[in-house]
Amino acid sequence: LEKISQAAMARDVARKARDSVRRKGTFELSGLPGKLADCQIQKREGTELFIVEGDSAGGSAKQGRVREYQAVLPLRGKILNTYVNGKNNGEDQSTKALSKMMSSNEIVTLINALGTGSKDFNIENLRYDKIVIMTDADVDGSHIRTLLLTFLNNYPFNQLIENGHVYLAQPPLFKVTKANKSIYIKNEKA
């Protein structure tokens, strides 16, 4: 009985230490992905994380952002397409899907930037008020946007959508200039 009690206390101390480190690290720069251009505000309220497609778009987004409250995270390539319907497949399938997704460096980078954790997900540790997916207006951008939304729709990350933290930005497809006047067009029909 004493060994059980000591083991329970050790688990509790370890959990508190993990939570303390996580809370401490939530708004500190250490441990954040190198590609992340973080914002200057150290609180979540009013901050925005722009997830952009590729390093070149990341460079443009970094130049055009308001550093005070906007962060930019460029992701390269397409993430793994894994979705599990928890109602039909059960918890075991969700766990397998999550571990499969965690094999992607881009997903690990995204989760680290969000600050919520994965298996020990806690929405209270979310570093940004708004998560804005901003991909190119072409077919590849649409596919990457769909894959990111699919990932965010999986448990436990679906809480980000349910709590109104996920947004989509629609960039223009073309810029048309005539006589020193420019307009942006979002599709080929315009």
Where are these regions (language model features)?
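Charged C-terminal transducer/switch regions of large nucleotide-driven machines
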Residues: 24, 33, 165-190
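GHKL-family ATPase ATP-binding module
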Residues: 1-78, 84-90, 121-123
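Acidic beta-strand-to-loop metal/phosphate-binding motif
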Residues: 51-53, 128-138
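A short alpha->loop->secondary-structure connector
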Residues: 67-69, 151-157
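N-terminal assembly/transducer modules of large multi-domain enzymes
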Residues: 1-10, 134-143, 155
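Conserved nucleotide-binding/hydrolysis micro-motifs of P-loop NTPases
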Residues: 56-58, 77-80, 138-140, 166-168, ...
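Alpha-helical scaffold elements adjacent to nucleotide-binding pockets in ATP/GTP-utilizing enzyme cores
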Residues: 106-109, 143-151
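Intrinsically disordered, low-complexity regulatory segments
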Residues: 32, 61-131, 161, 178, ...
